[in-house]
């Protein structure tokens, strides 16, 4: 299949990578797993055995008129432990390579169908100035955009990192979440070829 470039030319790409039917359950599962894997998972609380103190019975069992108590660190006491204390855990979910590649194929194909994929010959700036990238994107009428290049140029990275709703990745750094998070995906021809090679 052929894709039109912003300069008026065309580039031939694989039907497998850019002409796949959209599989919503697959994309949902892969995106959910990706976000789950990004969770820190380090939350920790103390249960009644973790809280310091409370080794002695606060008062005798009978004869005081008060409710019986065995420890001052009971979860119903102020300063006591948490009933179901959170422990550090791994939130990651298993996604095999075939599923991950299939989800990326679905997303790229949907971007093509919705005309959200903008192909350019190259995208570079001469200096790390934000206004240089801002002017280029304004000229192309792009506000929310993921820029995918063959190799991330330091000038381009520095110039774009202060712009809201703009991110720069190389072809190996794209992921399902970044591809769907922006209104448009601006990709250079060399990056497109590398991505096609990885997805085909």
UniProtKB/Swiss-Prot annotation:
One of its GO terms (molecular function) is rRNA binding. Pfam families: Ribosomal_L4. Gene3D superfamilies: 3.40.1370.10. InterPro entries: Ribosomal_uL4 (IPR002136), Ribosomal_uL4-like (IPR013005), Ribosomal_uL4_dom_sf (IPR023574). Keywords: Ribonucleoprotein, Ribosomal protein, RNA-binding, rRNA-binding. One of the primary rRNA binding proteins, this protein initially binds near the 5'-end of the 23S rRNA. It is important during the early stages of 50S assembly. It makes multiple contacts with different domains of the 23S rRNA in the assembled 50S subunit and ribosome. Belongs to the universal ribosomal protein uL4 family. NCBIfam families: rplD_bact (TIGR03953). This is Large ribosomal subunit protein uL4. It comes from Alcanivorax borkumensis (strain ATCC 700651 / DSM 11573 / NCIMB 13689 / SK2).
């Amino acid at each position: 299949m052929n894709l039109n470039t912003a300069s008026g030319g065309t580039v031939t790409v694989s039907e497998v990578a850019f002409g796949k039917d959209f599989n919503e359950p697959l994309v949902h599962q892969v995106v959910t797993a990706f976000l789950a894997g990004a969770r820190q998972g380090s939350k920790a609380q103390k249960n009644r055995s973790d809280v310091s103190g409370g080794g002695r019975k606060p008062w005798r069992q009978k004869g005081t008129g008060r409710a019986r108590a065995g420890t001052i660190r009971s979860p119903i006491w102020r300063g006591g432990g948490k009933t179901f204390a959170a422990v550090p855990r791994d939130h990651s979910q298993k996604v095999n390579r075939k599923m991950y590649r299939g989800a990326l194929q679905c997303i790229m194909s949907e971007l093509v169908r919705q005309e959200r994929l903008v192909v350019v010959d190259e995208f570079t700036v001469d200096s790390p100035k934000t206004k240089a990238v801002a002017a280029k994107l304004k000229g192309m009428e792009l506000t929310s955009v993921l820029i995918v290049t063959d190799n991330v140029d330091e000038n381009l990275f520095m110039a774009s990192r202060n712009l809201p709703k703009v991110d720069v990745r190389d072809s190996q750094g794209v992921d399902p979440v970044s591809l769907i998070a922006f209104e448009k995906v601006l990709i250079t021809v060399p990056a497109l070829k590398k991505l096609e090679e990885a997805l085909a």
